[in-house]
């Protein structure tokens, strides 16, 4: 089942967390999170993403919606393991 994609233009949570579908366009350096260098932080290696594969994946920060695998937000946290 395809979940609706998080829309950073209209989603208040996405705006608060500075979510971007393309991490290259996000200000990762200014909001640097521990675990990996900012340029290696993506939704696909974040603990909040709930799938191990797929271009669009469910995220626990956006219930019922999907984030892009190469996206990023200010809550990025390195996936354990």
Swiss-Prot record:
Q: What does this protein do?
A: Specific class of high-redox-potential 4Fe-4S ferredoxins. Functions in anaerobic electron transport in most purple and in some other photosynthetic bacteria and in at least one genus (Paracoccus) of halophilic, denitrifying bacteria.
Q: How does it assemble?
A: Homodimer.
Main subcellular location:
periplasm
GO MF terms held by the record:
4 iron, 4 sulfur cluster binding; electron transfer activity; metal ion binding
Q: Which organism is it from?
A: Halochromatium salexigens
Q: What is this protein called?
A: High-potential iron-sulfur protein
Top-level taxon of origin: Bacteria
Question: Which terms under GO biological process does the entry name?
Answer: aerobic electron transport chain
Keywords tagged on the record: 4Fe-4S, Electron transport, Iron, Iron-sulfur, Metal-binding, Periplasm, Transport
């Amino acid at each position: 089942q395809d979940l609706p994609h998080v829309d950073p233009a209209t989603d208040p949570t996405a705006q608060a967390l500075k979510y971007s579908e393309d991490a290259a366009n996000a200000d990762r350096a200014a909001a640097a999170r521990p675990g990996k260098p900012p340029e290696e932080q993506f939704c696909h290696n974040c603990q909040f993403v709930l799938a191990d594969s797929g271009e669009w994946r469910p995220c626990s920060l956006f219930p019922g919606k999907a984030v892009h695998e190469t996206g990023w937000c200010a809550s990025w946290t390195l996936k354990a393991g």
